[in-house]
Amino acid sequence: MINRQAILHRPLSQYAYSTAEYCLTIRLRAANNNLCSCVLHYGNRVDLTPLDKFRTLKMEKIASDDYFDYYEANINSDLDRVCYYFEMQDADERLYLCADTIATDFPEDRTEVYQFPFIRREEISDVPHWLKEAVVYNIFPDSFADSKRGISCTAKDYFDEKIGQTLHTRLGGTIRGIIENLDYIEDLGFNCLYLNPIFTAAEYHRYDLLDYYHVCPNLGTDDDFRELVSEVHSRGMHIIIDGVFNHSSWYFFAFDDVVKNGENSRYKDWFYGLKFPVVRPEDGQRPIYTCFAYERKMPKLNTSNPEVRDYFMDVCRYWLEDFDVDGWRLDVANEVDKDFWRAFRAVAKKTKKDSVLIAEIWENSERWLQGDMFDSTMNYEFRKVCRDFFAFGKINAREFNSRFVDMLLRYPFPIVQGQLNLLDSHDVSRFRSLCTQSPSVAGDFSTVDKRFRLAELCLLTSVGTPSVFYGDELGVVGFEECDYRAPMPWANPVKDNRDLFRELIKLRRSNDCFIHGNFRVLDYDERGKFVFARATDSKRVVVALNAFNESNDSFSVLPDCEPIISYNYDAQNHALGAFGYAIFEVK
């Protein structure tokens, strides 16, 4: 019997979306191993063709998790208005899914089946093509460099007379330091930079912004940044900057005016939750105004206020137009007014059509990825599932598969291709440090780098845009903020993984399967075996890994050819040793 409770289809969602004019992707969920076939029937929703004369497509099972199988079909036709229904069959019965009704009888009328009203160009699911092809190097400016292959590790505070505030640093990194090390970044294979905040701010992290129109003097000048952008573009690379529009510094001109003038301030409606008189609390005191978290120095902006919106729309345009940056990573995006983001997107795309907008949202982001706000989000879910499988070893490959499939099917596939996958960032512990936390390590740290290597392999071969935090290639570690934002160890790498990164990035960028190919899981077990394929119409790449501290000889699905990259692989027995991997190219 077909398990009716497991059947799911949601129209106009990640289960039914357009990828081009006259092209639709349709998905269906069913119980594990329940259906023996699934057929999609589709036709023109505005003509009179009988429903039993509809065109048909056999749906492919594209993924399975612990409970469900997922089927998919791609409609490439001459239709821009489509209606459709599903025919499902197991050994005992045939059922039809028609507009959320499961029936044993054939549907009789178009009003009884699913509708895709019209494939509108502006609603086609996609991201700028260059984002799919990007391999991102994320730089925390204060920590990276102030010279070629060097950083002073010296705080160089600066008193800004115009603002009347001291601007702090911790390690002394500069824009000039980034310019002088572009050869290093390019040599590793990265083709996109993402910089944490560079605008004028009081603290070294620069998430408490004082001036949105200038580079922080501690980092350099506006002209230094123009030079950086020019140098990046001359190498065929892209550059993304950090935008902090959820909150500002408590010495930002508008909030400073509120403190000074109270209810008479023309900016009193620029901020959330003000109680007059507004005072700046002492350290340890909770503010009486709304902030980012409870950070007293970061009052929350009222982004639904038209004046606030207009101010930051100009900031958006200014950096895209005057400095020619290629996109924005947008801080605390899920706390900002959604109409603000819709307006922001309109300005960004009008100013620079292929600019990208990446939201900092740590959870499910369906609501923000409908094509009216963001192109992408920072995919912390990728980090979490890799942490639990590779670093902690607390889930097996079956559980890893289930969570990975959920992540991959959460959005339309073109949106998944642009998700910013990461293992660490300025906000979380270094992944290599997490690899010391597995119970199986137990004082034996010989597996730490092997676990880290497998995670990087997964990052650079999976669907999505990989992002690497500066210094991961040199073994930077750290659980606490001051440690995971450590100075770049130019002279004394903790662990030199540059060859690994070069090899994997070169493989990714030279093989279209990793950029535009689909993703199919081929095999997994209850231990550490995980095998997947990335494929285009003309080529297929198979990636096999063993995230377990024992050899595994059950890799029967591997191609009968030499791997292009491997570690601890026994070709004769189709076996992978502890933490081994192999990548095969099949033409």
Description of each model-found segment:
Residues 1-34, 107-129:
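Non-catalytic, glycine-rich low-complexity segments
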Residues 15, 25-27, 521-558:
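Carbohydrate-binding surface patches
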Residues 32, 82, 572-587:
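C-terminal beta-strand-rich structural cap/linker in extracellular carbohydrate-active enzymes
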Residues 32-79, 89-103:
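Aromatic- and glycine-rich beta-strand/loop motifs that create alpha-glucan
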Residues 134-136, 140-191, 198-317, 321-322, ...:
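Substrate-binding/active-site clefts of carbohydrate-active enzymes
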Residues 142, 371, 376, 420-441, ...:
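Aromatic/acidic polysaccharide-binding cleft in carbohydrate-active enzymes
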Residues 162-176, 208-221, 295-309, 326-335, ...:
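The substrate-binding groove and active-site-proximal loops of carbohydrate-active enzymes
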Residues 229-237, 247-263, 321, 331-419, ...:
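Active-site-proximal helices and loops of the catalytic beta/alpha 8
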